[in-house]
Amino acid sequence: LYDILSEGWDVVLIDSMAEVQNAIVDTHKGWMSSKKAETELLNLFEKHNLGENDANVNTAFLVIQQVTKGGEFAGSNRFKHMMTGMAHMEWTKEGERTFYFSKNRRGGDMSVRLFSLQNRNRVGWQGTLGVES
């Protein structure tokens, strides 16, 4: 992971934080706790986000995080704090797909958007929840 990231990437997708964190713990055969692995990952993300890699590229990380059965965020408060934004994809009771931000340090629209994946190779945005489209 360290070697690959050192090349410098515009965007890196992590699916999921828990899987990567557990892989690091497993690789270190018991001498690294889950909390320490999370700290290592967050420090690595921050380093590359600041462009501290061979290409001096400011890397954006899109990190998929699991939720509890109740739909609550399943990570640590430090993880939540270190993120620039937190987006959610959920189903409505009517079966529609939604996308919204609960945190966005860069500002912007925080409304709940409806979308469809019916068209091949294209996301169909269908309006904003609660607003006529």
Predicted regions and their residues:
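P-loop NTPase motor core
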Residues: 1-100
